[in-house]
Structures are given as structure tokens and as C-alpha cells.
């Protein structure tokens, strides 16, 4: 989860372990890489990483919950050098990162990540828009950790996104707690 405000204190009340990464791809990648290294040093294995987070979507209604196991970058643009939008040049990591689904009972969606609070339709094909998912997925891909995400749609990625995001945080936090409990049961 990027921000403590997204959990509305519900994770702390229930002693649910959570890593708050901070906003954006760099913060997310750095904090998760450190946490995975520490976990591997202490336990000898990597945990399954689940990203609970809020998203905008021009396709899905506010209040929707979607599971993501495919992730793309919506702001990687090296088209001027002939590369496809969303592709990081000169590396072997595919532009779409895909993992085994962790939440097959939920609607599935593609998460488009970028370091900008989106208020319009993204230029890459994705169902939901966030600021950390692809970075977390890439760290897990490179480290060999299982990864998935549960995303709560707070807004339509439009001109009202900021207000709608804040208004829907309590609903999002309750949904995250519910899906965390289901993950433990399943």
C-alpha cells in the first residue's frame, strides 16, 4: 500500500502487516526491494507480495474492486527512438508483466502505472490507473516473488479524481481488510 491514509487505520487496528511504500514508482521499488532483502535474510525465502491500493479508472465505476496480475507502464515513452509506448528500452523485462492470478474470484484488470495522478484516458491499454503497481511488479519479477494486487476504484480518473479519491478512502480500506481476510482463508 502506498499511503497509510489508504488503510484508514484499519490494518493497524487488526495488526495486519503492511508496508507503506510512499507515492510513485521510485519510492515503491526502493521500499519493496529493501523489504524483500530483509525478509530473505531473516527467513531464507521470499513472501507472496500483495499490493492493496486505490486506483482511478475511466472504464470501471467507483466502488469496483478488481484484481490485477498484469501490469504496464503508462508513462514510459521512448517513442522518439522507435520504441513502443510503455516499453523500457535495452532490457529483457517485457513491457507487460504478468503473474499467476492470486484472486481469481474477482474481476481481472490490467494495471497501468505512472508517476502522475491521471485525470484523463491513458495512452496505453489498461483498466485501472495507479502510481506504484508496475514498479512493485517489476521488483517481484526480478526477484522471483509471487505478486498480485487488489485495487479499489475510487474515481474515474477525471477532473473530480482528487475529491472522489479522498471521499472513497473509507470504502477502499474496508474492502482491503475484507480481501486480506479472504486471502488468509483461501
Locations of the language-model features?
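Glycine-rich phosphate- or other oxyanion-binding loops that anchor nucleotides, phosphorylated ligands
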Residues: 7-186
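Gly/serine-rich nucleotide phosphate-binding loop at the start of the catalytic core
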Residues: 3-5
